[in-house]
């Protein structure tokens, strides 16, 4: 979701 991890879109 774009919080701390770019992969955790």
UniProtKB/Swiss-Prot annotation:
Miscellaneous comment text of the record: May be produced from creatine kinase by limited proteolysis.
Family of the protein in this entry: Belongs to the ATP:guanido phosphotransferase family.
Subcellular location as annotated: Secreted
Organism encoding this protein: Potamotrygon orbignyi (Smooth back river stingray)
Tissue specificity remark: Expressed by the venom gland.
The protein, known as: Orpotrin
Keyword Secreted in record: yes
Predominant subcellular localization, coarse grouping: secreted
Keywords: Secreted, Toxin, Vasoactive, Vasoconstrictor
Function statement: Vasoconstrictor.
GO cellular component: extracellular region
GO biological process terms, semicolon-separated: vasoconstriction
GO molecular function: toxin activity
